[in-house]
Amino acid sequence: MTLHQNDAILTPSDETTTVTSMNFLTFEDNYLAGQSPERKIIMTNKEKALALIGTFVSGDTAKAKELLATGYIQHNLAFGTGADAFVAAVEGLAQAPVKTTVNNIRAFEDGDKVFLQTVYNFAGAGEQVGFDVFRFDADGKIAEHWDNLADKAAPNPSGHTQIDGTLEKKDVDKEETRKIVAGFVGDVLRGENPDKLTSYYDGDKYIQHNTAIADGLSGLGAALEAMAKQGISMVYNKTHMVLADGDYALACSEGTFGGVPTTYYDLFRVENGFIAEHWDVMETLADKSTWANENGKF
């Protein structure tokens, strides 16, 4: 693995949530049901994001339209941009012979953004683990979306999957969490100060969910050595976002893997000032000739 120096820019839910046909009451719902408007249920941004991915299961195009800003910006390069394109995707999945399933594992919120870790199976095509980031506008509508997806894989050398592990989120200073993770990504993953590697870990205490790497700093070192022997380099060129909620932070970066343009979404849990646990999704960047929108991955 070659760690490459370059430029940089710099919640979970307590339970796994199976997203089905989520039914949050609007003003009109309450009114028609004979309830007082004052009893209207106000959705949080996290609930709105979960409701939106829930429309893949329910086929509820009206709900999708309600949640999305008209000028919705899509960064998943397999889909067109705009609210209409999203609604068309919901309609298409609803008509598929095999029902889509959506299983949210962790959900976080940071300012105007919500970030989710979810297992999808779109129309029976196979399970994929994904990270989604949604940006909300001033009116509370979902205005922009980024994501990274990878096929669900077998447990790694330490027996961990891409989604298991700690679910509890601690109420700690998210800015301190962001600072630690941003520092690690810059110093270690982008290679700006590689000698600081061990300072980010509490000895060998490190739970790893990457599909090919074992637990501990020792497991990471062994994996990097094996990659180097195979001539495989993993390069992080630029980090676009570091989102934090409690003791968790998600870093969204781009670079190359084995010389191929790749996007990296890395979720870290921080404990006592050290990186304690890591989940990730790597996705090969699609050739521009295949893009369904011109917004770019970031």
Features from the language model and the residues they span:
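C-terminal and inter-domain tail/linker signature
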Residues: 2-8, 12-298
